[in-house]
């Protein structure tokens, strides 16, 4: 039987980072993953360049960029290991990077630079600390015993493992083609943890074939919009780019909104957020003889202008021949466009999974669950960040908090 201090289940961003930090605290760590490759989500993120953090994260106010039943749970970990801490590590390894948009940091060359950095960190154990990886290796079962001392025994496809502590870093259900499974949720339920129902997040929205028929020909077009969902005094809104697809909507604005969207509720879009369109059109009647489609093409892609004006006969006239009321209706349709999605593209295209292990059953200081010696970190926990590097920073911060807690518990000074 293989004996280690810590067994980490999952060789993704959180699992690898936790392993490296723990080994550098003198712990012997075994990382296992049923998938043959490490950190595949890092590899494919950011168009292959990995949006590895966001420099504008305010760790004191995680509710501004994270969601979950209790987003403030993340404050402790995010405050103790900040975006600036991870940036310093990236710089230490000589990895060139750049800011692309709204604090989002990307590797200049390739996400592989970041993966190689994490693997080098795993090799930099101190005080006898080591990291061993078993891949591909499936977990068959996990049991706990408190005699003669508290420990776990894992049955795996490569044999038995005895560990003083277990860290579940197995991620969510997003992108199953790179190995996502519900293993973390099953382990949580086995040991009595509560769950917040998982759902796809940062995911394209879809519409019924009938509802989307007028817009299907716009697939591939992108434009900046203001997008909103929710009711009451504080609806959720984002000003980002939107992308038309064959089945619905994608792009940063849509991915952001999708994390908050509730089934059966409408979304509202303003396709010209920086323009008083009705006033502009009515004022232009005196000086322009263009038809409405050509007029709108000054601010919108011509395919959008053509598709929109084709919806009603009164919008297919020249600008001077269109009534003020019809122009107002056209402006409203573009600047207060309300549609109810039929669903999402699901886990296959979701960047992350919302929901997960209920944070009420975890320590915000250590990530340890109410089951002694069992920890949960990263995406498997009910903390979900915005698009733009927030979810990776949660992975680094929760992993760091966990690794430091493991060292304090298993290698006390």
Which role does the model predict for each range below?
Residues 2-4, 156-165, 237-239:
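Core beta-strand elements of the Rossmann-like FAD/NAD(P) dinucleotide-binding domain
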Residues 135-149:
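A conserved short coil-to-beta-strand element within the FAD-binding core of flavoproteins
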Residues 125-139:
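A conserved beta-strand/loop element that lines the FAD pocket in flavoprotein oxidoreductases
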């Amino acid at each position: 039987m293989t004996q280690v201090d810590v067994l980490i289940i999952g060789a993704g961003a959180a699992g690898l980072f936790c392993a490296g930090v723990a080994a550098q605290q003198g712990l012997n760590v075994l990382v296992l993953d049923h998938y043959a490759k490490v950190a595949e989500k890092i590899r494919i993120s950011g168009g292959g360049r990995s949006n590895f953090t966001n420099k504008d994260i305010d760790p004191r106010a995680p509710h501004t960029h994270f969601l979950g039943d209790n987003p403030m749970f993340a404050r402790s970990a995010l405050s103790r290991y900040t975006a600036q801490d991870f940036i310093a590590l990236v710089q230490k390894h000589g990895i060139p990077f750049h800011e692309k948009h709204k604090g989002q940091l990307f590797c200049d060359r390739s996400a592989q630079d970041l993966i190689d950095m994490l693997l080098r960190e795993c090799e930099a154990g101190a005080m006898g600390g080591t990291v061993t990886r078993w891949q591909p290796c499936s977990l068959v079962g996990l049991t706990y015993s408190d005699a003669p001392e508290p420990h776990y025994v894992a049955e795996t496809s490569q044999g038995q493992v005895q560990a003083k502590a277990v860290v579940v870093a197995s991620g969510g259900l997003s992108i199953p083609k790179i190995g996502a499974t519900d293993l973390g949720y099953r382990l949580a339920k086995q040991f009595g943890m509560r769950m917040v129902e998982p759902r796809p997040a940062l995911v394209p929205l879809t519409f019924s074939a009938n509802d989307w028929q007028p817009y299907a020909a716009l697939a591939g077009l992108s434009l900046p919009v203001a997008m909103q969902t929710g009711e009451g005094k504080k609806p959720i809104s984002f000003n980002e780019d939107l992308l038309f697809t064959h089945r619905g909507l994608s792009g940063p604005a849509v991915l952001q909104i999708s994390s908050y969207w509730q089934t059966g509720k409408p979304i509202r879009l303003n396709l010209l957020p920086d323009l008083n369109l009705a006033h502009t059109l009515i004022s232009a009647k005196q000086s322009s003889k263009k038809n409405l489609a050509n007029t709108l093409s000054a601010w919108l892609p011509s395919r959008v202008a053509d598709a929109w004006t084709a919806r009603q006969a009164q919008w297919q006239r020249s600008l001077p021949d269109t009534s003020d009321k019809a122009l107002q209706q056209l402006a409203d349709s573009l600047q207060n466009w309300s549609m109810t999605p039929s669903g999402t593209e699901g886990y296959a295209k979701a960047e992350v999974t919302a929901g997960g292990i209920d944070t009420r059953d975890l320590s915000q200081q250590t990530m340890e669950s109410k089951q002694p010696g069992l920890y949960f970190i990263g995406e498997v926990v009910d903390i979900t960040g915005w698009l733009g590097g927030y979810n990776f920073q949660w992975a680094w911060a929760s992993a760091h908090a966990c690794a430091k807690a493991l060292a304090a518990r298993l290698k006390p000074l």
